[in-house]
């Protein structure tokens, strides 16, 4: 049967539960176990798809089209398992399903309550997501003590009672601050968060202590005594330069031995050779490139988490220190298109996004890259922006724009597609008045690349599969005009619509843009061919 590891957090949020959980998963996977991961989000939103990036950060898209928490991106980068919509659910989804059952009469007129109906639905979803795996690591979002988390914590308490200690393990992440004025490490916050857990029936088996320095032996003994946890199960999670150092850091403290003993897992020794190579490559680069990322969410870089990591992965596989400079597209717009800050950059990237704010600043950045032969990579909106700039400045389509920004523009080269065929053959429709949630082209889609194109050379294939998240498409009515002006359509969707998927410029050192999100499938072990090619282009531009 599947063994469960439940990861919770206390004291404050943003301690790195996702990284800790993913690191444990990576270690267990290296010991030969088939591991999956789940993220349980206590918010009432159905999913993060319509949440502001400033509040929630990046929305990570799975292969099957689920819009999920960015932690699922960490999961896929740390382990080989591919996440699906079963690996993530929220309070909103739980209540939505329970209420739907009540409306259908599934509860036979009974009073629907948090216990047992909500907790039963949570447990059902956990078991569904974990089915078929040796170990499932379940991260509970939020902080112990938050009212929103209580049904989830009660559900995992019940699972411990039902499955037993040898099939479940509680790992609790706590903050252990260092007070500089006193010159002391303080364990009281950890004592209080464990007390909070005990009050709801949860006893941590492992305490992972987030610290900015190594934990002294006496403090470890103190935490073990007051929190009723074995001393060897008090594990330090220290600040590191790269998150990819975390698996080795936790393994060196024996966390996997504690887990395998309690869960009675008879497995091989851990082999972290691959992780050691990754860390060595990060710490010993031979080259340096500077890449400008021009967007509107630059004040919260978590909005571009997978993209940042994908560039780092490309750095690993090209022995390059990729230095990212975030450029606010609104500031370019407000300064009459001043792009002087881009002159020292080796390459320019415009990522995805929504809304009209900062668009003209992004267009100015694309124009600079095209006219000055600077390597350019556009992703999702970044492709649409590149196409709008080309339509205006090269193809002569005055008033070219997207209907997302100007519904009555003279040349809608990017528009809302109202009907398309999904990967399973069904037809979906949408219009301008449709709800924002659930009206996007989502998940992995087949893409056909033109023989001899830059796209085909980068991927080494004419058939690829990449993940999407967008509502607006290139208007195919304008494609002939754009192609006559020299634009190359390097890739189109495999469906009957033949939607534009990639564009490139033949008379430019390296100019490529795609409608899909390749960053969602990059990982440190393999990287991604598109980002590797982009970093190589930046290196070539630097040498030139």
UniProtKB/Swiss-Prot annotation:
Gene Ontology biological process terms from the UniProt entry: 'de novo' CTP biosynthetic process; pyrimidine nucleobase biosynthetic process
Residues the record lists as binding L-glutamine: 353, 381-384, 404, 471
Residues noted as binding ATP in the record, renumbered to the chain: 14-19, 71
Notes on activation and inhibition: Allosterically activated by GTP, when glutamine is the substrate; GTP has no effect on the reaction when ammonia is the substrate. The allosteric effector GTP functions by stabilizing the protein conformation that binds the tetrahedral intermediate(s) formed during glutamine hydrolysis. Inhibited by the product CTP, via allosteric rather than competitive inhibition.
Positions contributing to CTP binding: 13, 146-148, 186-191, 222
Cysteine pairs bridged by disulfides in the record: none
Record's catalysed reaction(s): UTP + L-glutamine + ATP + H2O = CTP + L-glutamate + ADP + phosphate + 2 H(+); L-glutamine + H2O = L-glutamate + NH4(+); UTP + NH4(+) + ATP = CTP + ADP + phosphate + 2 H(+)
Keywords in alphabetical order: ATP-binding, Glutamine amidotransferase, Ligase, Magnesium, Metal-binding, Nucleotide-binding, Pyrimidine biosynthesis
InterPro entries noted in UniProt: Class_I_gatase-like, CTP_synthase, CTP_synthase_N, GATASE, GATase1_CTP_Synthase, P-loop_NTPase
EC number(s) from the headed UniProt entry: 6.3.4.2
Binding, Mg(2+): 71, 139
GO cellular component: cytosol
Name of this chain's protein: CTP synthase
Provenance organism: Neisseria meningitidis serogroup C / serotype 2a (strain ATCC 700532 / DSM 15464 / FAM18)
């Amino acid at each position: 049967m599947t063994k469960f590891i439940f990861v919770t957090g206390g004291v404050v949020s943003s301690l790195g539960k996702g990284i800790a959980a993913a690191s444990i998963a990576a270690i267990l996977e290296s010991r030969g176990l088939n591991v999956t991961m789940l993220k349980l989000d206590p918010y009432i939103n159905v999913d993060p798809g319509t949440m502001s990036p400033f509040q929630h950060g990046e929305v990570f898209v799975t292969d099957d089209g689920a819009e999920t928490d960015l932690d699922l991106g960490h999961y896929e980068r740390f382990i080989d398992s591919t996440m699906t919509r079963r690996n993530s659910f929220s309070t909103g989804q739980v209540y939505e399903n329970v209420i739907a059952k009540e409306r259908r009469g599934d509860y036979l007129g009974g009073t629907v309550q948090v216990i047992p109906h909500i907790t039963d639905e949570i447990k059902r979803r956990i078991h569904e997501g974990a089915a078929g795996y040796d170990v499932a690591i379940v991260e509970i979002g939020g902080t112990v003590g938050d009212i929103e988390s209580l049904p989830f914590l009660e559900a995992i308490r019940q699972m411990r009672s039902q499955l037993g200690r040898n099939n479940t393990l509680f790992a609790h992440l706590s903050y252990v601050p260092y007070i500089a004025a006193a010159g002391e490490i303080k364990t009281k916050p950890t004592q209080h968060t464990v007390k909070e857990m005990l009050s709801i029936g949860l006893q941590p088996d492992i305490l992972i202590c987030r610290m900015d320095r190594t934990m002294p032996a006496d403090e470890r003994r103190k935490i073990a005594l007051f929190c009723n946890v074995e001393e060897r199960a008090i594990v330090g999670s220290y600040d590191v330069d790269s998150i990819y150092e975390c698996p080795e850091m936790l393994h060196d403290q024996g966390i996997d031995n504690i887990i395998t003993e309690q869960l009675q897992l008879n497995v091989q020794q851990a082999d972290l050779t691959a992780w050691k190579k990754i860390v060595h490559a990060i710490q010993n680069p031979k080259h340096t490139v500077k890449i400008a990322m021009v967007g509107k969410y630059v004040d919260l870089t978590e909005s571009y988490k997978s993209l940042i990591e994908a560039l780092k992965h490309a750095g690993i596989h090209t022995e390059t220190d990729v230095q990212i400079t975030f450029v606010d597209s609104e500031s370019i717009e407000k300064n009459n298109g001043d792009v002087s800050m881009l002159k020292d950059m080796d390459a320019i990237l415009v990522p995805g996004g929504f809304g009209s704010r900062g668009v003209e600043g992004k267009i100015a950045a694309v124009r600079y890259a095209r006219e000055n032969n600077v390597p350019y990579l556009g992703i999702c909106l970044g492709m649409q922006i590149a196409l709008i700039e080309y339509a205006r400045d090269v193809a002569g389509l005055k008033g070219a724009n997207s209907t997302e920004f100007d519904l009555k523009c003279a040349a809608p080269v990017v528009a809302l597609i109202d009907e398309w065929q999904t990967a399973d053959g069904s037809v979906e429709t949408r219009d301008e008045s449709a709800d924002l949630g659930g009206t996007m082209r989502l998940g992995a889609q087949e893409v056909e690349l033109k023989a001899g194109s830059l796209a085909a050379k980068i991927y080494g294939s004419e058939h690829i599969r990449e993940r999407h998240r967008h509502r607006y498409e290139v208007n195919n009515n304008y494609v002939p005009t754009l192609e006559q002006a020299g634009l190359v359509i390097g890739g189109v969707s495999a469906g009957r619509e033949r939607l534009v998927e990639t564009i490139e410029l033949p008379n430019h050192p390296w100019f490529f843009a795609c409608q899909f999100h390749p960053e969602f499938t990059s990982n440190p072990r393999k990287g991604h061919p598109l980002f590797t090619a982009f970093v190589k282009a930046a290196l070539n531009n630097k040498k030139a």
